Amino acid sequence: MTSAGLYIAVVDDEAPVRTALGRLLRLADYEVAAFGSGDEFLASLPVRVPACVILDVHMPGISGFAVQAQLRAANCDIPAVFITASDDPGLDAAVLAAGGTLLLRKPFTSDRLLKAVSAALGTGCGSKS
């Protein structure tokens, strides 16, 4: 699957993380929108559904897990790659139980992120628009 034109959403409360991930994904020919909160991302869904979402686990307000739960409750099958700075060993299983594709622990390499997104895109049915 080619990355050209596929829309990826980045949801992280830290602006530098959103900027860095957005830049990396754009260099890989993805279209990217960055959101500073889960609520902001969820509000965008009626307008445009991403092919994949990158979700921070821990955010103020609604967490990445809560975003994923709302997506699942709405039967919105968007592949999710979770990211975290936490070293909690239970998070890997929690991500899978929540329906996430996988968990990347910060800091991670550009290559690992791109491989994770590519793998996630092979598992879902998000929109290419």
Which residues does each predicted region cover?
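Two-component/phosphorelay signaling modules centered on CheY-like receiver
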Residues: 15-33, 98
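Receiver (REC) domain active-site loop signature in two-component systems and cognate sites
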Residues: 59
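Alpha4 helix (beta4-alpha4-beta5 surface) of REC/receiver domains from two-component response regulators
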Residues: 66, 87-102
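Acidic catalytic/metal-coordinating carboxylates
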Residues: 36-37, 62-66
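C-terminal output helix
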Residues: 90, 108-118, 125
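Active-site beta3 strand of CheY-like receiver
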Residues: 48-54
